[in-house]
């Protein structure tokens, strides 16, 4: 019987003929031994236009608008009991174009979120409808080669990178995005913004005894030298604005520095969508690995209108954990978010279908996926969260078999990760359901 490690750091990827294996990691947590992990990836994120849900093949075209289907209730999005009312109110202000009305959404997830698959298309659709208020939160450097935030080119060197899904340290200081970056003098980061309209920025870092400084420049013009020195270890934030916007930021530490990420925004009105994905992540990242007080401080500072919790794929391999531990961990994660932000809207987003091959070579849905979806739906109802059924939105059981047989394929060879086209389909349905929920909210 497989025993689930806390947190689950598991990503299965098969690349047809081209395999790239990352180092095997072994660790112990709470008496459980982490099995060897192979981090492989067989998809390449692309910046291609969105395609409608009904299209199997489509040439590049402008972003489509999801077609709203107003109804009393949705089988895919359960937003009963006013679970999303706070979010809908914020979105309505942005839609009306109220000055400075910025709706912030943070999306915690696993490897597809790491590559900004699904989330990148959700961001594009929402910003097309409600206004573009900027890129949002971006990590300091790439923890994995496939990390990306659409519209941002990120390069860095000299950083010691520690994602929350590794086990070298358990101090819980992972910032908002779940990755810490430490460096001495030799490190640097350059962030190129394809849309130069970003004008409001904020550096997330750690204050600590004997901390060094970070030199910030925008478009080769010096902005500030930010001291990270502090009497005690605590979160630090440095906000700055660039008149007219910036297309390039440079960060250079001097002495010891510990950074988390940077936000890039526009004045609004509009939407900001933070994609906070960790490769191999599970719900235990939020329920155990993030330091509770530190993470609460990060959330309160970011002040999102909606927190999306999107895990389950990596847990699907661990039957015993699903039966005896998963629900408790999910409830704990929700309780942590509620304690930090009592009024925030929370949406639990189910995992996608996940396929596996039978002895005869056929592709079937892993039987643990529907069980996870059922647990998530129940917990969402019990805790006052909204719930989006990604599994059903894709087509339910057998979806990965159909998507793998599609031309072009909508899922990679690992039967886990969607192709960019598959990700766009999910994003289109998700945004359609949110927009329909907003229209229902308006007429209540």
How would you describe each model-predicted region?
Residues 92, 113, 117, 123-131, ...:
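Sec-exported extracytoplasmic/periplasmic mature domains
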Residues 52-95:
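N-terminal low-complexity, Pro/Thr/Ser-rich intrinsically disordered segments
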Residues 27-28, 291-292, 352-444:
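Catalytic His-Asp segment of secreted/periplasmic serine-dependent ester chemistry enzymes
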Residues 28-69:
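Juxtamembrane proline-rich low-complexity "stalk" or linker regions positioned immediately after a signal peptide
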Residues 7-24:
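Hydrophobic membrane-insertion alpha-helices, especially the h-region
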Residues 79-95, 286-300, 328-336, 371, ...:
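Alpha-helical scaffolding within the catalytic cores
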Residues 104, 113-328, 417:
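Conserved SGNH/GDSL esterase-like catalytic core that processes O-acyl groups on lipids
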């Amino acid at each position: 019987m497989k025993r689930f490690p806390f947190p689950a750091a598991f990503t299965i990827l098969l690349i047809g003929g081209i395999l790239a294996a990352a180092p095997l990691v072994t660790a112990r947590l709470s008496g459980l031994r982490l099995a060897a992990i192979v981090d492989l990836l067989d998809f390449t994120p692309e910046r291609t236009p969105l395609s409608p849900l009904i299209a199997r093949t489509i040439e590049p075209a402008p972003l489509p608008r999801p077609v709203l289907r107003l109804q009393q209730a949705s089988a895919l999005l359960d937003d009963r009991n006013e679970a999303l009312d706070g979010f809908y109110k914020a979105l309505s202000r942005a839609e009306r174009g109220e000055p400075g009305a910025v709706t912030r959404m943070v999306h915690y997830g696993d490897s597809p979120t790491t590559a900004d698959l699904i989330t990148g298309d959700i961001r594009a659709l929402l910003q097309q409808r409600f206004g573009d208020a900027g890129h949002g939160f971006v990590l300091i450097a790439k923890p994995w080669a496939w990390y990306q935030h659409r519209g941002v080119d990120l390069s860095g060197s000299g950083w010691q990178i520690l994602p929350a899904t590794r086990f070298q340290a358990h101090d819980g200081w992972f910032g908002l995005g779940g990755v810490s970056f430490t460096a001495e003098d030799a490190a640097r980061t350059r962030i190129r913004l394809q849309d130069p309209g970003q004008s409001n920025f904020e550096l997330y870092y750690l204050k600590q005894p004997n901390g060094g400084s970070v030199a910030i420049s925008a478009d080769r013009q010096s902005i500030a030298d930010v001291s990270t020195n502090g009497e005690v270890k605590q979160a630090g934030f440095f906000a700055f604005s660039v008149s007219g916007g910036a297309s390039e930021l440079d960060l250079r530490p001097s002495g010891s520095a510990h950074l988390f990420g940077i936000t890039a925004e526009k004045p609004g009105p509009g939407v900001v969508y933070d994609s906070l994905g960790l490769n191999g992540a599970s719900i235990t990242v939020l329920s155990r690995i993030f330091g509770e007080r530190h993470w609460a401080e990060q959330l309160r500072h970011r002040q999102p209108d909606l927190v999306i919790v999107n895990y389950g794929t990596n847990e699907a391999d661990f039957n015993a954990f699903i039966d005896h531990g998963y629900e408790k961990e999910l409830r704990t994660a929700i309780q942590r978010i509620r304690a930090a932000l009592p009024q925030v809207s929370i949406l639990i987003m189910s995992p996608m279908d996940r396929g596996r091959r039978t002895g005869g070579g056929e592709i079937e849905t892993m039987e643990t996926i529907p069980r996870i979806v059922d647990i998530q739906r129940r917990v969402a109802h019990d805790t006052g969260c909204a719930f989006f059924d990604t599994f059903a939105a894709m087509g339910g059981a057998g979806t990965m078999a159909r998507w793998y047989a599609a031309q072009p394929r909508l899922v990679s060879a690992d039967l886990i990760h969607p192709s960019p086209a598959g990700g766009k389909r999910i994003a289109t349905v998700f945004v359609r359901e949110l927009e329909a929920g907003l229209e229902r909210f308006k007429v209540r």
